[in-house]
Swiss-Prot record:
GO cellular component terms, semicolon-separated: cytosol; small ribosomal subunit
Keyword RNA-binding belongs to the record: yes
Keywords: Ribonucleoprotein, Ribosomal protein, RNA-binding, rRNA-binding, tRNA-binding
Top-level taxonomy: Bacteria, Bacillati, Cyanobacteriota, Cyanophyceae, Oscillatoriophycideae
Name this protein carries in UniProt: Small ribosomal subunit protein uS13
Protein's organism: Microcystis aeruginosa (strain NIES-843 / IAM M-2473)
Assembly information from the UniProt record: Part of the 30S ribosomal subunit. Forms a loose heterodimer with protein S19. Forms two bridges to the 50S subunit in the 70S ribosome.
Residue ranges, annotated region (Disordered): 97-127
GO annotation, biological process: translation
Length: 127
């Protein structure tokens, strides 16, 4: 089983697609890695030789920041924004949209599910 950066690649998929299971590697970066290492993109992961896997692993780990390192780098950038008190950092901390989207309506993904507010109760009518 091919294991790169602590992630097991799916055995039955093409290498080009399987590399996208790594955080920080999309289709274009996957194609770039395969052309640089000389591995055929149509090869299935289970058919890769140990040398191919080693070549992919070393190329990716030396040239790109992926998985835990990339997640840590992103988290540190967000934390830095919050620590220096920027508007963006505050929006991140409050869980609101960061890039200027409206929040009066929409923004449900960032704000979470609706919290229903009870309507005003009607006073009992006197008869």
């Amino acid at each position: 089983m091919a294991r790169i950066a602590g992630v097991d690649l799916p055995r039955d998929k093409r290498v080009e697609i399987a590399l996208t299971y790594l955080y920080g590697v999309g289709l274009s970066r996957s194609q770039e890695v395969l052309s640089a290492t000389g591995v055929n993109p149509d090869t299935r992961v289970k058919d890769l030789s140990d040398e191919d896997v080693a070549a992919l692993r070393t190329y990716i780990e030396t040239n790109y920041q992926i998985e835990g390192d990339l997640r840590r780098w992103e988290a540190m950038n967000i934390k830095r924004l919050a620590d220096i008190g920027t508007y963006r950092g505050r929006r991140h901390r409050l869980g609101l949209p960061v890039r200027g989207q409206r929040t009066r309506t929409n923004a449900r993904t960032r704000r979470g599910r609706r919290v229903t507010v009870a309507g005003k109760k009607k006073a009992p009518s006197k008869k």
